[in-house]
Structures are given as structure tokens and as C-alpha cells.
Design a protein with these regions (language model features):
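Mid-to-C-terminal alpha-helical segments outside catalytic/metal-binding sites
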Residues: 190-226
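Short helix-capping segments at alpha-helix termini
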Residues: 103-109, 159-162, 204-208
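Short acidic/histidine-rich active-site segments
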Residues: 138-139, 162-186, 212
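Structural preference for beta-strand elements that scaffold enzyme active sites
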Residues: 6-8, 50-52, 83-85, 110-112, ...
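Active-site glycine- and acidic-residue-rich loops that bind
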Residues: 114-119, 138-156
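Alpha-helical scaffolding segments of alpha/beta enzyme cores, especially the outer helices
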Residues: 30-37, 41, 68-79, 96-103, ...
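Active-site gating/metal-coordination segments in enzymes
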Residues: 1-78, 134, 139-144
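Divalent metal-binding pocket/active-site signature
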Residues: 42-120
Length: 226
């Protein structure tokens, strides 16, 4: 309330090893029904509705239970319009996800490839973007991430006419239950690097204010609307 910032909570599930026992035996349609309820009615009996579906895939590609999760997410998205954001390491895994989602009938414009900067081949990023999903480059401002790599990936997408498929994120501020202070092992990072450093750097490289507005305002608004 003090900042008027909108906080969007997800429904969904993490990768195979972290799926709770209560969800492991569900069919894809049963899981989709659960997620649709959290999107349209509220989470865990509250009136707080989820605003998107979040999944995670194993680094070597979707495992059988994760394929079930993809099918459930596609069903829930098709019935609600909610976007699906997926923790995805590398272009090969992203292609596998997109194939499963498309086969399940999903319009790939309702899919966000989270952590797309983990794919170093810019041609793979552009190929993926042309299939319709949002390409999210995150860890902006992170000490463990090359900011030059993020910059080159963003510019490659923009110069290829794909700025409407680009999202930028800090991937910061999450709570770590393994530590008493709740901080990630890499330490606390705020939410200022994008506005204070990355966008000015894009401008210095000749990217217009209209384009940066599209990437930071219009694209996320369109992605999360349903």
C-alpha cells in the first residue's frame, strides 16, 4: 500500500524433485483445475488470486512429471488466459517445452522463457522469439551475471525486430528459507539496476525511449493481462 506497487502472486509448481506428494498423483486435468481455481477464485481458501502460472524444468529437459505439469499449465492457461512463466536453462530445454505446449494447444504468446540469458547463442534466442513466446533476460544487476552479455542479447532481439517479445528482470528479492536472514547466498539485491543502469546503457547504445518503454511497460502489461 505505501508504494502502490502491484505484487503478482503465482500458482504452479517447481521442478520434479520439489513437487509435493499431494500433487504428484494428480492427472494433468486435476492439476489444471487446481490452478484455475487459484487463478479465478483464490489461493488456499483466501480471496488472493494468482496472476500467472510458474513452473520449472529440470536442466537436462522435462521429466515425465514435468511434462504433465506443462500439459496442466497449458490447459489452465487456455481456460483463463493466464501466462505461463517457466524456469528454463538453455535453448534446447526451451524448444522441448514449446513443443509440448504447442502440442497441448497453447498459443506460445502465453509463455515466458525465464532465464533465457542462460542460452549463449543469440540465434537460438531469436529463433525462439519468432515462435511467439516472451524472452526474459533476467539477473539485471547481478554480480554473477555478465551485464554485457545481457546487453548484447537484448540488442540482438531489438535489432531483429523482436522487441515486442522481450522482457527484462532483476530476478532479485526472493526469500531463502535455508538461511536465518532469508537472503540468497549471493546477498541482497534491490530493484534499481534496471532503471538506473541497464536502461540508460541501452539508450547509450542507440535504443530509443519508445522501444525501452515498450520493453519495460507495454510488454509486461500485455504478458500478465488476462
Amino acid at each position: 500500500d505505501p508504494t502502490s506497487i502491484h505484487i503478482v502472486a503465482p500458482t504452479g509448481v517447481y521442478r520434479d524433485a520439489y513437487v509435493p506428494s499431494s500433487l504428484r498423483e494428480m492427472s494433468d486435468s486435476e492439476l489444471a483445475d487446481l490452478w484455475m481455481k487459484e487463478l479465478m477464485e483464490g489461493i488456499d481458501g483466501t480471496s488472493i488470486r494468482a496472476g500467472f502460472i510458474k513452473l520449472a524444468m529440470s536442466d537436462d529437459g522435462p521429466m515425465p512429471l514435468e511434462i504433465r505439469n506443462l500439459k496442466a499449465a497449458a490447459r489452465a492457461s487456455q481456460n483463463t488466459g493466464a501466462v505461463i512463466a517457466i524456469h528454463t536453462i538453455g535453448g534446447r530445454v526451451a524448444r522441448q517445452e514449446m513443443d509440448v505446449l504447442e502440442e497441448a494447444g497453447l498459443d506460445l504468446s502465453r509463455f515466458i522463457w525465464v532465464h533465457a540469458q542462460t542460452e549463449p547463442d543469440l540465434s537460438v534466442l531469436k529463433e525462439a522469439a519468432r515462435r511467439g513466446p516472451y524472452i526474459e533476460l533476467d539477473t539485471v544487476g547481478a554480480p554473477f551475471q555478465s551485464q554485457d552479455q545481457l546487453m548484447e542479447a537484448a540488442i540482438a532481439l531489438i535489432e531483429s525486430g523482436l522487441s515486442d517479445r522481450l522482457l527484462l528482470s532483476h530476478d532479485a528479492g526472493w526469500y531463502n528459507p535455508a538461511r536465518a536472514d532469508g537472503l540468497p547466498d549471493s546477498g541482497y539485491r534491490g530493484y534499481t539496476a534496471l532503471a538506473e543502469d541497464f536502461i540508460p546503457a541501452l539508450s547509450a547504445r542507440g535504443i530509443s525511449e519508445e522501444t525501452t518503454h515498450q520493453i519495460t511497460v507495454n510488454n509486461p502489461a500485455r504478458a500478465f493481462a488476462f
